[in-house]
């Protein structure tokens, strides 16, 4: 083999080696902007949760769906619980927005607004059962996480605000203990119905057209909160 042939052969091997390195390099460095990867990981985490459940959820499974190294989700979220925490926080953001969507279509009357929030609550659970269970029935998310804590508190404060608008006389504000009884009762009504539907109960509500279903949910919520006294 001549020297020139040897140099050409080594050059060819170098090209092949560099190609292999590029092919095996984590895809996140080539296919994703930092923010896009974060969102893609959350989207894939949601799909992983839906298909495999909490017990089968793993960072490796999420990474495989996005075609990145398993270190990528660990870099962004730390561990599986960190990723589930971020997923729960995003769930609460969508949960708040879904209730807002229903309130926009409802009359401005405080009781109608509270009822619409309840419908949004239940419909969100029906549309996102895996996320709903993660938000309310799992110990995996870290509720000491500042972002999750903030959005969860915002959701609760929205409930308090709408119950207060129905029941409180501004000239004689209720004591916190009395107000919280009203809030707890309204919350139990919406959450109880949502939980029953997510668990597969009340099949007649699950099998009808969404618009009819939503009207019936509104009727149930309306009846459940009818005990709340109107403001004087």
Map each language-model feature to its residues.
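Helix-turn-helix
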Residues: 40, 44, 51-82, 86
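Amphipathic alpha-helical segments used for helix-helix packing
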Residues: 126-143, 195-203
